[in-house]
């Protein structure tokens, strides 16, 4: 009964390394992925990590599943993990339908991803001034969103999670309104969660109230229109 919605991605890289390198507790093959696709709370294919292998081989379990998606579920959300891929290799990766990436990149790598239609997910280590400046100067807000990845419990407790990333982006020069936009609206659209991400008639009443929009420290939090948090000194 926790006041939070949890969605899942289909594990696409289990095991994440070659069986010749390490043993694994199990294998999620194409059949298992098809089964998971039927689950109500599954909204995407989780990050595909064997990016070098997948653009060279077509008999992998995940490659079979991607072909199935292209035939039976075109447009399904497929998340990638492709640090350093550029040019033709990046095109091969995108050709498989993998059009999201959250890993760390140089500015040139960011440009190529956005120019080729990939949704770029910005985590803490990608809050580089030159990257944020490029996005702002070219008004590329629709093509990116703020995310977190592998947040440890102590970091979550001490710094927060997405609120910390948004705050840091603002302090690095990202416009306040667009920082909030890229943490709410664009991620919702990316995951096809069209019932949220904006305050509008007919949408879920999930929102927070801030005393100062430039200080991402929630004073009040509402879930489905019900207040679930209030600062003690608020």
Which residues does each predicted region cover?
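Divalent-metal coordination cores built from histidine and acidic residues
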Residues: 1-75
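Divalent metal-coordination and catalytic microenvironments
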Residues: 6, 45, 113, 149, ...
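Hydrophobic faces of well-ordered beta-strands that scaffold small-molecule active sites
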Residues: 6-10, 43-47, 78-80, 100-102, ...
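Glycine-enriched alpha-helix->loop->beta-strand junction motifs that scaffold or abut catalytic
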Residues: 41-42, 73, 92-100, 114-120, ...
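Divalent metal-binding pocket/active-site signature
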Residues: 47-105, 124
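Histidine/acidic-residue-rich catalytic or RNA/ligand-binding cores of hydrolases
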Residues: 57, 87-94, 129-141, 152-167, ...
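Short acidic/histidine-rich active-site segments
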Residues: 102-103, 121-127, 141-160, 202
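Active-site microenvironment of metallo-dependent hydrolases
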Residues: 157-173, 177-234
